Amino acid sequence: MASTSFLTLGAMRAKLDMSATVSNTGTGQPLTMVSDNGAGVIVVLPCANDTVPDYVGGTAPCQKAVAGSIHPIYPGAPISLGGTVVKGDKLMVSGGQFVKATSGKKAVCCAASDGGAGDIVQAAPIPVVA
């Protein structure tokens, strides 16, 4: 299992939408924003497959009644893996986690290190040639 420390950058507070089929979110889980009124906590849902998440779950779980922490996706952000990856693999959202992207799917970020299902690793930017 990958062991990494995470520096909390830009952590925000969020609750799960009442329509969520899960009871809480985990660290590095991809999340989609449902609403943000600018005056309180953000409301989120687990991200659908093959979509680009707005946030990832932080170290404090988001629940329907209790706000937890979320982070924007940035280099170094914690991401939860749903399968085996190697450093530099492009990642997509599938089954509520990040997995190695398949042809024709939306890659969100790259893996900053090797890891397996259930590991929390750091996100890395996708290299682009200008």
In which residue ranges do the predicted regions lie?
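Surface-exposed, low-hydrophobicity beta-strand/loop segments enriched in small/polar/acidic residues
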Residues: M1-A130
